[in-house]
């Protein structure tokens, strides 16, 4: 018998599960490529802000053409510091320039996957990537996972390390703190296990505190029964 599961409620997109993006500071993207393709823009950091939707602080930068943009703040950035975006930007923390212009061995973050997309890779607090080698038609970068990934030389990146590192070193300790962490992004918390529920609420529920049936389930199972190891090839420890 099918149950009304949490993931079925989540799929309806009610406010219980919707991200409170109206509280977030805004999008963090690079200046459009057509503006800084041939010239370098100079900007000044006006303020450093907490963003509840991110693991890193953001900095508001005012550029010389009068526009203001949010950037991911690098470690060591200061209010009043000048930063540059463009192909002729100096090699310094917080500056953004194409990967073709960044020397090997440099820490970078917020790397574009496609030239002009505004930055897609390495954006979490405390993360950084390493420029490993440069060739005529590609730049090889080591991502935080250790993967070596190829990027086009025109893809832009920011020099430095994303601020906000070490946030996971301090233990949460109290459930109340975990509550506020989840509330900031409207995460569904606490999330009870299926075996702790009543039998009417979950296929694994009931007072016996064991599933009572195989935890593997077909890929074609109806939504109310599709919980556990979905279409698993194998379960348990490998012998």
From Swiss-Prot:
Part of the 50S ribosomal subunit. Forms a bridge to the 30S subunit in the 70S ribosome. One of its GO terms (cellular component) is cytosolic large ribosomal subunit. GO terms for biological process: cytoplasmic translation. The keyword Iron does not apply. The keyword Ribonucleoprotein applies. Keywords: Ribonucleoprotein, Ribosomal protein, RNA-binding, rRNA-binding. The gene is rpl2. This is Large ribosomal subunit protein uL2. Residues 200-239 are annotated as: Disordered. GO terms for molecular function: rRNA binding; structural constituent of ribosome. One of the primary rRNA binding proteins. Required for association of the 30S and 50S subunits to form the 70S ribosome, for tRNA binding and peptide bond formation. It has been suggested to have peptidyltransferase activity; this is somewhat controversial. Makes several contacts with the 16S rRNA in the 70S ribosome.
């Amino acid at each position: 018998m099918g149950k009304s599961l949490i993931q079925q409620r989540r799929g309806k997109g009610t406010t219980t599960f919707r991200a409170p993006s109206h509280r977030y500071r805004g999008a963090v993207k690079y200046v459009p490529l057509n503006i800084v393709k041939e010239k370098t823009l100079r900007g000044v950091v006006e303020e450093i802000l907490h963003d509840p939707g991110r693991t890193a602080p953001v900095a508001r930068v005012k550029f010389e053409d009068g526009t203001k943009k949010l950037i991911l703040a690098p470690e060591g950035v200061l209010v009043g510091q000048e930063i540059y975006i463009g192909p002729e930007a100096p090699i310094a923390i917080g500056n953004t320039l194409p990967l073709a212009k960044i020397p090997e061995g440099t820490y970078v973050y917020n790397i574009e996957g496609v030239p002009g997309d505004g930055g897609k890779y390495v954006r979490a607090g405390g993360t950084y990537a390493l420029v490993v080698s440069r060739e005529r038609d590609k730049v090889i970068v080591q991502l935080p996972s250790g993967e070596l990934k190829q990027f086009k030389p025109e893809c832009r990146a920011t020099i430095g390390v994303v601020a906000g590192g070490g946030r996971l070193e301090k233990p949460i300790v109290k459930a109340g703190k975990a509550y506020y962490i989840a509330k900031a992004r409207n995460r569904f918390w606490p999330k009870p296990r299926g075996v702790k529920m009543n039998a009417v609420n979950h296929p694994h529920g009931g007072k016996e505190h064991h599933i009572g049936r195989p935890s593997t389930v077909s890929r074609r199972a109806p939504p109310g029964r599709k919980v556990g190891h979905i279409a698993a090839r194998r379960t348990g420890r490998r012998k």
